[in-house]
């Protein structure tokens, strides 16, 4: 196996990085500050280049079930008259769709995928990164236990 990698943060970026690093052959552990991750946030758009990465990680079916494939972006006046529109995702000729979805739902899809791929014991919640030291050979991380 590759290196032992610590990912500090179980948000969208950290969980995506964990899946990519695991796929590249590294032993990954994710540390997340909150004790119980929940679906928080608002709607986001996943552009086709990011959807490609998530498809490559095997999340195509989960994304299609949790998101709406965006086919057009429109700007309208306050009385509903269209000012401008542009095709998006597959409708724009991209090989991958553009998705609109709740950011918290995306985080949960990624968290479930990380737990399946790495094992539930490789996602440690309630662990806040307090600091770290790095030298030429290694990094030592310090955590505050917030599981109470």
Residue ranges and their predicted role:
Residues 1-5, 49-148:
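Conserved N-terminal helical subregion
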Residues 5-7, 28:
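Conserved hydrophobic helix-helix packing surfaces used for dimerization/oligomerization
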Residues 9-11:
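Conserved S-adenosyl-L-methionine
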Residues 14-15:
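N-terminal Rossmann-fold NAD(P) dinucleotide-binding loop
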Residues 22-42:
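Glycine-rich FAD pyrophosphate-binding loop
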Residues 35-55:
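Conserved N-terminal glycine-rich FAD pyrophosphate-binding loop of Rossmann-like flavoproteins
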């Amino acid at each position: 196996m590759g290196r032992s990698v610590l990912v500090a943060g179980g948000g969208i970026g950290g969980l995506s990085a964990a899946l990519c690093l695991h796929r590249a052959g590294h032993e990954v552990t994710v540390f997340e500050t909150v004790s119980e991750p929940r679906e928080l946030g608002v709607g986001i758009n996943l552009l086709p280049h990011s959807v490609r990465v998530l498809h490559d990680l095997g999340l195509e079916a989960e994304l299609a079930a949790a998101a709406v494939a965006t086919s057009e972006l429109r700007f309208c006046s306050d009385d509903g008259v269209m000012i401008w529109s542009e095709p998006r995702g597959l409708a724009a000729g991209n090989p991958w769709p553009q998705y609109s979805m709740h950011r918290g739902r995306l985080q949960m899809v990624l968290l479930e995928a990380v737990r399946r791929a790495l094992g539930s014991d490789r996602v440690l919640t309630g662990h806040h990164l307090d600091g770290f030291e790095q030298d030429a050979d290694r990094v030592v991380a310090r955590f505050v236990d917030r599981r109470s």
